[in-house]
Amino acid sequence: MNKGVMRPGHVQLRVLDMSKALEHYVELLGLIEMDRDDQGRVYLKAWTEVDKFSLVLREADEPGMDFMGFKVVDEDALRQLERDLMAYGCAVEQLPAGELNSCGRRVRFQAPSGHHFELYADKEYTGKWGLNDVNPEAWPRDLKGMAAVRFDHALMYGDELPATYDLFTKVLGFYLAEQVLDENGTRVAQFLSLSTKAHDVAFIHHPEKGRLHHVSFHLETWEDLLRAADLISMTDTSIDIGPTRHGLTHGKTIYFFDPSGNRNEVFCGGDYNYPDHKPVTWTTDQLGKAIFYHDRILNERFMTVLT
């Protein structure tokens, strides 16, 4: 059931060296720097995104994710979701408007998996970067690098998947698009969506709470993905796997690392969902094919390197 949560809105990542991180996210991924704040955080967006930022970088001593935020339809929905979270037993933290530049008040909570999420209703609307709202051209001419289209999703590793599933489906209004079941029928991976997308956030069982596997950015075509692979090679960027295809979601994909060790994905294509679609199920005996559809062999680094 729709509870008013619209889409992924932003993610804040910790990076070890801001200048190297910006070279990666701006020059290689093609994000646009939009702002900086007095804490030293840098705000970035992809060119099609209409709000001011979707990625916040914070310099720190270790990499990883501070939090992921979802935008809700309006303040009334935010107040109701806040009440629902508290009624469900979640401790919520109020973050005032302006704590993130150009963003309204946020309601933060911790999922049973150990990850921090937040909800907000307002963020400065800047429109698509480099385009007018009236009679727009197809794309801006001066995009850099991969010219990432949007921040799309994040994949988390943590424990307590059933409780996390209940929170996201019963309180926040997500639905299960795809899953992986072990030989006992226990769900060990869950791909959750708010929309027709293959997923907006995903969780994989891991004994340690609160770990990040990757943040993902959308590209338009397979040719864009191959060009992204060329740019990864040209810049000697550390690559994990790809270009290849997932069995899960059927998206075409490349995984690589930012200079701090945070894993990034760029992808195109993939499945779509409507309310009458049943969840797609994979079994762990086919996990190699589910993750890497062509090779059908698990990459140990892909499964174990987390931030």
UniProtKB/Swiss-Prot annotation:
Q: What is this protein called?
A: Metapyrocatechase
Q: Where does Fe cation bind?
A: H153, H214, E265
* The protein's Enzyme Commission number: 1.13.11.2
- Where is each VOC domain found? 7-122, 150-269
Query: Would you identify the family this protein belongs to, as annotated?
Result: Belongs to the extradiol ring-cleavage dioxygenase family.
| Biological processes annotated in GO | toluene catabolic process
What NCBIfam families has UniProt attached to this entry? catechol_2_3
* Database matches in Gene3D superfamilies: 2,3-Dihydroxybiphenyl 1,2-Dioxygenase, domain 1
Record has Transmembrane helix as a keyword: no
Q: What class of enzyme is it?
A: oxidoreductase
The record lists its disulfide bonds as none
Please name the Pfam families in this protein's record: Diox-like_N, Glyoxalase
Taxonomic superkingdom: Bacteria
UniProt keyword annotation of Manganese present: no
Reactions catalysed, semicolon-separated, are:
catechol + O2 = (2Z,4E)-2-hydroxy-6-oxohexa-2,4-dienoate + H(+)
Please describe the quaternary structure of this protein: Homotetramer.
Part of which pathway? Xenobiotic degradation; toluene degradation
Q: What are the names of the required cofactors?
A: Fe(2+)
